[in-house]
């Protein structure tokens, strides 16, 4: 069966995502669309507005055939690490083609990735503490490969290409033109809105009928929503009670940020105020949110490394076509396939220990078990 894969967050699923899945299937002439989707937490450093099962169900009803979870250890990372986690998971699923939407589909992403593979991406170019890492990285890209575009989906596509280049058997890259408004912009264009706009409408209890598939309007209205508003008290408690040595073990903790975070947390009443207190020219808001989330979830560098060394394929759901594909490849997959979560997987030394640790907050807030005993949606 011809397969095409996409890496997504679907935070939440909307008409632009339905278009993207249809384009991927059409352009790749694929029988099966496989999606590696972020679990309950997303790359911008916050809980997804709906849990992973709600978002997987929406995707399966609107173009995806198989949805596999991108665990928190890969989902809540900077672009290159996020891309590596998603690309390697798709490759492990036996996917032939990697499709992604971009502002610049005309670019030869594989060629650019090869140029960057020989460029020096460390050293003196990253020692300007008055600029973010991303700004300095863009300058290195421009010097090494003549890359001047900085559009977010272009940069993410480039991260996909670099991760794909590192595979033993690289997938075919299939960039296609994005439709509608930019990823983090707010607004609506041709009945396609950014995920940010959809979240804004949902949280304000405004109608999303024009910007999500019809069947999802009532479905979304019945679902528990999640945000930093619910998580901030947990962050505050962690920062007020954890030892500094404990905080230093958290993934992506660097350069004394544990001091800055613990010094500023007492006076902050919400996440927005806290981020303004700790913000500096060196770090983007997304970088700081990711670190704050890692602290809240106690996601240590050790947990991230263990997840990379012992990857799993946790299936969230499939259509009949997806099930047929899964049955045809399950004995040939490079990684263990998980279709039912047992208690031993969630134990402190289990293969889903970090996922379970992170998802327990979602279960506590929303009252819906996220892992134990759950089977794939069908």
UniProtKB/Swiss-Prot annotation:
Transmembrane segments: none annotated. Disulfide bonds: none annotated. Its EC number is 6.3.4.-. It catalyses: cytidine(34) in elongator tRNA(Met) + acetate + ATP = N(4)-acetylcytidine(34) in elongator tRNA(Met) + AMP + diphosphate. Keywords: ATP-binding, Cytoplasm, Ligase, Nucleotide-binding, RNA-binding, tRNA processing, tRNA-binding. ATP binds at residues 7-20, 101, 153, 178. SUPFAM superfamilies: Nucleotidylyl transferase. InterPro entries: Rossmann-like_a/b/a_fold, tRNA(Met)_cyd_acetate_ligase. It comes from the Bacteria. It is found in: Cytoplasm. Signal peptide: none annotated. Coiled coil: none annotated. GO terms for biological process: tRNA modification. It is an enzyme of class 6 (ligase). One of its GO terms (cellular component) is cytoplasm. GO terms for molecular function: ATP binding; ligase activity, forming carbon-nitrogen bonds; tRNA binding. Belongs to the TmcAL family. PANTHER family: TRNA(MET) CYTIDINE ACETATE LIGASE. HAMAP family: TmcAL. Catalyzes the formation of N(4)-acetylcytidine (ac(4)C) at the wobble position of elongator tRNA(Met), using acetate and ATP as substrates. First activates an acetate ion to form acetyladenylate (Ac-AMP) and then transfers the acetyl group to tRNA to form ac(4)C34. This is tRNA(Met) cytidine acetate ligase. The gene is tmcAL.
